[in-house]
């Protein structure tokens, strides 16, 4: 063997590729016989070595890539940032999904590329590495899943699951990852079963198309070819394309010819081409062969089995069909290979070569603003853009190709390796794209608004589907909704209040005069804060099952109140103001708990003698069980306690019996309730000491006498402390259960009287079979004062009797006389509770029932906020039955809106359907298209927040930390413009604020110069044209104060900020989250400006949805959308996943030219483009003909590249010639136009391309035809042989049509001859039967002028074509129409 040849395989690893090269070299040098002998020796050597060296594979051989951790972390950071931008409304859902998939795909791919170098460096002889990279079993993708990450998966429908599997199979999957992994694996299993049959069927159809193609002649004489350039494809593919082909033209270097026409190309010639960098090489191809039904040797090239030109009679068609079909069978058998793992393509990036300032021509004709596929702002280049980067000493020039996105601004400083441009991969027609609809659903209910003009789609003129002309935001303004199908008059008026947990009831009234109120029963259920259920039957009212709902607010520490009394001195009649403080603020200020709790009814309405608050005095608390006694049995008068009546949710005080005692006694004892099965370790009536074990897990806390009683629920074990006396005479002891001896009744100076100075409790014990004895138990005495000093708790002004609103104090002993009290799990027991009862004098002038109304008022003093509870006497329309159905009256909506007292006796049998509402809210009217069904919108409290700088708060003796800047503080249920609990009759009085002029921070907080201000605020909803809504009275929105955000502006630059804010913020404006309103930082939530005041802005929270042009909006402006409704639909192009299980369907789609694929769309555009520009380029005469011709050439190249791309991605090598033969057949038909050659062909008749050209030349008239793509199935049914067609499909139809038309079958193909049993006209020995006639030899081979002209036009003006094609087809240069490649 030659020495040069020997060095090629010297000291190299022989893998699969090297073996192929070795065999081809051996065949070239030694021929087939010697090569087979050498290969036998190689095989024997291999088997011997494999037997001697075995390989074992263990789980420890799977080495995880070290860089995986930070790569995954980086991808998670990008995903998190993406989620934020989506929340802010900067990117929409499709862009977010697309970028998320590409981030994880890039991470997975990078890990896969890192895998091989990692193995080579750390463990080159790793069995996994050897196995997969030698080609024995497995491949990079499978090993990547074992040691890298499993990556993104497809679901059974082929859609992408955007949650990646970050683990690999070596680490193990989590539960979620396992379920997602099963999706893809299931898809792989199903595909394997289904597609195996498809592969066989594909082979059959392919063979059917090309079975008649046989090598029949040596040279067809064509002058055409396709040009291949080494610059436009990778070197490996360039070599594969050229080897075995035949040159269509001479190759010159300068004036020297190095290769001649019709010379076949070997490896040596290819190496010379590469080394000399010869530009476009024209090669012959089956596309340009002039044989109609056959193919010539030179257009086919070398035989794949041995290196010579193919012999005459070779059935190259069947070889081509099997070459493409057989790997398809292999592909389906390898579907489990990745198990549904997604593979796709990402855009190419242009990076800066060095640091410097970037400059380019910022011209609107060259670049214009756009959005990238991921929603980032960028500049779109419409043509080639020259970019210069100026560093310190070097100028770098770059050219950005057209249709690319420039990601930097002009004159911006860029760093080295920074991405400055993105070459969009989506412009190529070779990618598999599909148009997908993506629906975006609302995740909350609310009102729909949009910030741009929209227009109706033509097909949806009368519906609620709109198209967006430009990028804009859609807004869902928060608020609940409630539809009422009831009577046209509504209980709710615009700006009315709604109370917490209030229910909207849909009611139908059936007129019946017979029923009266006593026969109607109601049940009201509302959520409770305290979970107690009370059933109370009040006289004159039907039964109500209610759950008491109370709000507890604790009063501020009394000493501050006394100092603060100036604040409350000037007050109007019929009003009571009490400062309150929430428990959270009290904890922050470290103020001790005063124990006063205000108890507000749900609807904020107090009746007369309602309980306003209660006070638990810590002096009357005990931690032990015991008995309360008011006096001794013989000494105290009969006293009954007063009762509390629950009346419509208000604790009302009814003084039925007045307390007359001034003290009471508490006899402590220790009680243990034990289960019946427990073993007791002490006996009845025995004496024990402290900490004695009385049961298995129980010890006594005190010593004394033990009493054991068996009860229904278990064993009661009581321990009485005290002293035991054995009296001499039993009869003197009273037989009562016990006698209380108050202090001071015994002998003054005796030891016992000193010992029992608090009084004693005498109890007689009678044990069985033993002597009687008496137990003296200690007593705790509690003195009850004549009532708490009101001045100690409230400012003096509150205690004035002259006003008609009063506070009364009543002490209430919680437990009855002689009743045992049991402690519960170490909690203290309150024995006495002090009630504060609200009372007022009845106004004689008004006969209607008055009620007191509670509301919260807020005073802001230099950032320090104080809340006050204000109680006003009002005439409540809810308590007045006459005003119930008065449409002009508006008021509070309480829990019991449809109480029976308010139902007219003429209406009865109400049927109610309840829908509980969340929070205190305000009703708003809503514009509704449907007049029949009014709807309510309730703006609920959970969406409201306010922001403000709370700082510079300094006060002594009150430790208060400055609240952090921009803290979010929830607004109380009843504060502010939407929450004051006044009835809204006068619009002016609705907004009630207390403001201040000056604040002095001295020892205690004092507010001077108080004045009350009334503000009528701007408070309307705007429509898109800026006009104020004219609300429809039949539909309502209910706003809730918590849906609003309060934004307080800084006080230090008060005047400036007011001027600034008036220019920045306008009423009805939408503000995105993270945008800046004022100088003190970004705004925290998105929404619509609802109220603008001097020092604050109230914003109704809203959710933005970004929508791009062409998106479809569902719903009308101002319409209520519910949770889960479709907001917008995007139409976008998506790359189909390049999963191996989809390889075969792709090949089939291309070959069948299915309409779902994008080929037909692209071809249509290309034909149009060529028809527009061909006249300008080529001149008029041949324009249309050459346009159709080039369209066919372009479509053929495109098809070959698509099919090759699929197979090469799976590592399957198929020579282009095989695919070209198939593609030649499916593109060899043209469609006659309506106006063309009516005397020869019928309009819209399918004829062969060569036949059309020859007929046109023979008749010397122009032919009008269109390029037409047939799929392989239709091609099989459009052949010259009806026997072949009938044996494939639709036998009866084909034979019937052939009989009617009188078709002749010339039996030229293989299949026809097999069917009728004739000799097959194929085989290398068949050439002896084919004789050339003398007439054929005598014909001079003149080259026609037409061919010469076509050759001249097509191939001597290549530069002109290249520029035209690249501009009109929008292909990257690698994908020009004369190139065979897969890039």
Curated annotation (Swiss-Prot):
GO terms for cellular component: chloroplast; DNA-directed RNA polymerase complex; mitochondrion. Zn(2+) binds at residues 220, 289, 296, 299. In plastids the minimal PEP RNA polymerase catalytic core is composed of four subunits: alpha, beta, beta', and beta''. When a (nuclear-encoded) sigma factor is associated with the core the holoenzyme is formed, which can initiate transcription. It comes from the Eukaryota. GO terms for molecular function: DNA binding; DNA-directed RNA polymerase activity; zinc ion binding. Keywords: Chloroplast, DNA-directed RNA polymerase, Metal-binding, Nucleotidyltransferase, Plastid, Transcription, Transferase, Zinc. Binds 1 Zn(2+) ion per subunit. DNA-dependent RNA polymerase catalyzes the transcription of DNA into RNA using the four ribonucleoside triphosphates as substrates. It catalyses: RNA(n) + a ribonucleoside 5'-triphosphate = RNA(n+1) + diphosphate. It comes from Oenothera glazioviana (Large-flowered evening primrose). This is DNA-directed RNA polymerase subunit beta''. Its EC number is 2.7.7.6. It is found in: Plastid, Chloroplast. Pfam families: RNA_pol_Rpb1_4, RNA_pol_Rpb1_5. HAMAP family: RNApol_bact_RpoC2. Belongs to the RNA polymerase beta' chain family. RpoC2 subfamily. InterPro entries: DNA-dir_RpoC2_beta_pp (IPR012756), RNA_pol_beta''_euk (IPR050254), RNA_pol_Rpb1_3_sf (IPR042102), RNA_pol_Rpb1_4 (IPR007083), RNA_pol_Rpb1_5 (IPR007081), Rpb1_funnel_sf (IPR038120). One of its GO terms (biological process) is DNA-templated transcription. Its cofactor is Zn(2+).
